[in-house]
Amino acid sequence: MPPPEKPLGEPLDAPLDENELWLLSFYRTSEISGSLFFGKLARTLRPGPIQIDMTKHFADEAQHAWYWTECIRELGAQPMKLADAYQDQYASTAGMPANLMEVLAITQIFERRVINQYTRHAKAPGLKLPVARTLEKIMQDELWHIDWVKKALESLEPEYGRATIEETIERFRAADREVYARTMREHEERLRTLFGE
């Protein structure tokens, strides 16, 4: 059986440097954190479409953590143990979501950030083949995450009002910009090296 068509990337035997290992471990930690959060939430939701989609979302996040684990191992390393995930900073910046609508609003913003980051990473010079494959696999799910959350927020408009939902999304968008800027400053050297900036 011939090997699958290869996306752009370096040969499989290129080792991970410390910055690459950190970033892939950061992604993995974020996916684990998302899975745990959505899993707990899915257990508490009333039966219905949001509960079903939240359960699928939780399962996807767990699978993504596994994909990053496999990718790191394929590149001859072990995932780093990192204390915090990206989304852990949201609570201190924007406060804890107070209801399901706020959870979905912050999820919409976060998932868009993930897609943007993964798209940026997919264009990085010297992208390793296992990383390219992993990004490609995960981004398909991430697009669905954005779609289902958007539809779920629309379904909540009669309860919360479109204006309130839009204001909430904007509040979390501002918090995300702050968290992203802080993360970029904190890890600027690592990221500049990785993305050739």
Q: Would you name each region that the model predicts?
A:
Residues 1-197:
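Non-heme di-metal
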